[in-house]
């Protein structure tokens, strides 16, 4: 994270525990939320990059200002891919790419709501993020 210049953009694949565990990962998470704008998390199905059972996310962030809102796209719930028999393809992420609105983040619209609980695209405020970590609920990746 230290080599990223102000305004630099990063996308990185990390296991869930980086977003939830204490100790060293908690310090990394705190620095990420304070020194970077972690604006998007793409939750991937289990076993896409690592051994079976390992849950992963793609984190998208920019260096410069602290995190205010995090948009989460849940591509994990109800989806199963395997590297051997049913690999994930670019087409599987078309809805995410559409929701992401590259260059037009102000145009993002949630697809998740109480009326549409199957929607995959949801925004969490800084207050919701802080509360989730204080209560250790894992709301962003549960």
Residue spans for each PLM region:
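A conserved structural/catalytic subdomain of Rossmann-like adenosyl-cofactor enzymes
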Residues: 1-142
